[in-house]
C-alpha cells in the first residue's frame, strides 16, 4: 500500500512525511537534541529516536512527520506506529516541538494529523504515552481537549518520581 507523504492534517501545518534517509536523520537529530523534552530521555527513548525514523521508511503502518521553520530547520515532529500486537491500535511514538515554535497550534495540528492517519489506516484508536512531570501539563490539557481520556498511570516508569500516563482516543466510525 502506498501512502501519500502528507494528509489533510499534514497539509494544514505544512507537515511532510519522512520519505528519505536524510529526512529521517534530520528528524532523529531533532528528537535527540538536549533540552527538547521537559525531562531527560531514557536510554530506550534515545535508542528509539536514533533508529525508528529511518526504520519507518516504506512502512504503511508506521511513520514520522516533520515541520520546518522559516529557516528550514526541523521545528516539530510526530511519530506514529501500529502497536506491536497489530490489532488496529496505533501509538504516538514521539511528539516534540521546538520551544520557540510552541503555543502556535502545531501540537494540536500534528495530533489531528495522527488521528487522520489512524482513521485512514482503518485503525481503532490512538494511544499516547506521556510523562507525569508538571512540565507536560500543557500536553495533558491538549490531549483532554482533543477527546483523549487518561486510561492508566504507571508509577516511577521513566525515573523514580516520574510516572507515565496513558491517554487513549477511540476512532469514531461513521456508516457510509
Language-model features: where?
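Conserved catalytic-core motifs of GNAT/GCN5-like acyltransferases
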Residues: 129-131, 144-165
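Conserved acetyl-CoA-binding loop-helix of GNAT-fold acetyltransferases
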Residues: 97, 103-116, 141, 145
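Conserved GNAT acetyl-CoA-binding A-motif
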Residues: 118-131
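Residue-level recognition of the GNAT/N-acetyltransferase active site
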Residues: 93, 98, 102, 131-133
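Acetyl-CoA-dependent GNAT
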Residues: 18-93, 98, 111-113, 117, ...
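Short acidic/glycine-enriched loop/turn segments that link adjacent beta-strands
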Residues: 86-88, 136, 158-163
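Short, flexible, glycine-rich and Lys/Arg-enriched loop motifs at helix boundaries
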Residues: 130-140
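Conserved N-terminal entry element of GNAT/NAT acetyltransferase domains
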Residues: 1-22, 169-176
Amino acid at each position: 500500500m502506498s501512502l501519500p507523504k502528507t494528509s489533510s492534517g499534514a497539509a494544514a501545518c505544512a507537515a511532510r512525511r519522512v520519505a528519505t534517509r536524510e529526512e529521517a536523520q534530520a528528524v532523529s537529530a531533532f528528537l535527540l537534541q538536549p533540552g527538547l523534552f521537559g525531562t531527560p530521555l531514557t536510554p530506550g527513548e534515545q535508542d528509539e529516536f536514533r533508529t525508528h525514523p529511518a526504520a519507518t521508511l516504506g512502512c504503511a503502518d508506521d511513520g514520522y512527520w516533520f515541520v520546518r521553520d522559516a529557516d528550514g530547520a526541523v521545528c516539530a515532529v510526530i511519530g506514529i506506529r501500529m502497536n506491536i500486537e497489530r490489532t488496529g491500535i496505533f501509538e504516538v511514538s514521539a511528539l516534540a516541538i521546538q520551544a520557540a515554535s510552541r503555543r502556535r497550534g502545531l501540537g494540536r495540528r500534528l495530533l489531528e494529523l495522527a488521528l487522520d492517519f489512524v482513521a485512514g489506516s482503518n485503525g481503532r484508536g490512538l494511544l499516547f504515552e506521556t510523562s507525569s512531570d508538571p512540565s507536560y501539563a500543557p500536553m495533558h490539557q491538549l490531549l483532554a481537549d482533543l477527546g483523549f481520556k487518561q486510561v492508566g498511570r504507571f508509577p516511577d516508569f521513566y525515573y523514580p518520581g516520574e510516572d507515565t500516563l496513558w491517554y487513549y482516543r477511540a476512532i469514531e466510525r461513521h456508516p457510509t
